A protein has these predicted regions:
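Positively charged n-region of N-terminal signal peptides that target proteins for export
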Residues: 1-4
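Catalytic cores of phosphodiester-bond hydrolases, prominently lipid phosphodiesterases
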Residues: 20-388
Length: 388
């Protein structure tokens, strides 16, 4: 019996990953750190911005109902084509390797503003009672375009965040997941359409509070964490850099993907983003500059690479408006993955059988790899996060 137990312990020791103490964490690359030491080496020697991974665009979006899509197509065929995509539930996306999620939110502090979509009424659709009940509750709602493109895998922000948090709890070693948010408040030219409430500083205060109602601050890479004791967030990013990969595994960072007045409203007079939950898409000359949305991978390639090499975190897109999928055109995808942008967003982690084989995934089946513009030789071709 003791012999069997001893054999079992020996087998466990032989197959378990090496402890950090057994690894050469000052080795020049992950492969030289010792047997089973790549993870420990990367966690200590790579920073959050030293990676590249794939995520999804408008991650919450379900397909527009056929009758409403037909109505849109009658008046604007090209717009209808651009809206003709959808996603599987967030949990399934994460299981498939997505490490960036995009959520569009509308402000609905009293509830009920989006409970009765005009498009559904116009074409005679009867919505499930649970939809109206859910949308009647106070809080931020998640949708693409009010009244016509309103279906979501998680109709409320809290539901989306709870799903992300639950997945993270079951997979605590994941690389930091980027959650970008669009704050939607544009009107649309549709009969009977809702007029969205505008995003002012009070609305953004409520948005931060709703995020913190689900995620504790210690599970979020906040601007304050990155800034530390530097005068500005930009100074911290360019002079010291982002936290290490090891310090950010199992965590999330949130970014407000907006410009101009919305960024000003979110900052609310702050020098950088002191006390805020989200980073903002601030221009490089802003004290709050740290994260940038540069979506045009074909034309912004040099800009993306330059900013990544400086130390900024960048999100770009592999495809848009179903164009690349319909044409099976991989040029934008390939440019995006090679540009250095840390988070590359797609609507097609899996192909859409209606269009063809186009999809956007990390090479070699990786979930995340060393960033191609930040000394990728350090990873020696090994994954930062392996296939799920």
């Amino acid at each position: 019996m003791r012999s069997l137990l001893a054999c079992g312990v020996l087998l466990l020791l032989m197959t378990a990953p090496a402890l950090a103490a057994d690894c050469n964490l000052t080795a020049p690359d992950a492969a030289s750190a010792g047997a089973d030491c790549a993870r420990a080496w990367m966690d200590q020697n790579l920073r959050l911005n030293d990676i590249v991974t794939i995520g999804t665009h408008n991650s919450y979006k379900e397909a527009i109902p056929d009758k409403i899509m037909a109505l849109i197509r009658m008046g604007a065929r090209k717009s209808a084509d651009g809206l003709d995509y959808s996603h599987i539930p967030l949990t399934d996306q994460l299981n498939d390797g997505a490490r960036a999620i995009e959520i569009d939110v509308v402000y609905d502090p009293n509830g009920g503003l989006y409970a009765h979509p005009a498009g559904a009424a116009m074409v005679g659709l009867t919505l499930p009672a649970v939809f109206a009940d859910t949308m009647a509750k106070p809080g931020f709602k998640v949708l693409h375009v009010q009244d016509i493109d309103y279906r979501s895998v998680c109709p409320t922000l809290v539901a989306c965040l709870q799903e992300l948090k639950a997945w993270s709890a079951a997979h605590p070693d994941h690389i930091p997941i980027l959650v970008t948010m669009n704050a939607k408040d544009d009107e649309i030219p549709f009969p009977g359409s809702v007029t969205p409430l505008k995003f002012d500083t009070a609305a953004f205060d409520a948005l931060d509070a709703e995020i913190l109602s689900v995620f504790p601050r210690d599970q979020i890479v906040t601007p304050d964490v990155v800034q530390g004791d530097f005068p500005t967030l930009k100074d911290a990013v360019l002079q010291r850099g982002w936290p290490t990969l090891g310090a950010t595994r199992g965590k999330f960072l949130f970014a407000l993907d907006e410009e101009g007045d919305k960024i000003k409203a979110y900052q609310g007079g702050r020098k950088s983003l002191e006390g805020r939950v989200m980073f903002v898409n601030a221009p490089e000359d802003s004290p709050a500059a740290a994260y940038l949305t540069l979506n045009e991978a074909l034309t912004d390639t040099a800009h993306i690479t330059h900013d990544v090499e400086l130390g900024y975190l960048v999100r770009t897109r592999a495809d848009a408006d179903t164009v690349e999928a319909r044409d099976n055109n991989t040029a934008r995808r390939d440019k995006a993955l090679a540009s250095g942008a840390q988070y590359v967003s797609t609507d097609y982690m899996q192909p859409d059988d209606r269009f063809g084989p186009y999809q956007a995934r990390m090479p070699k089946g990786f979930v995340a790899a060393c960033n191609p513009k930040r000394h990728p030789e350090r990873c020696a071709g090994l994954p930062v996060e392996a296939e799920p």
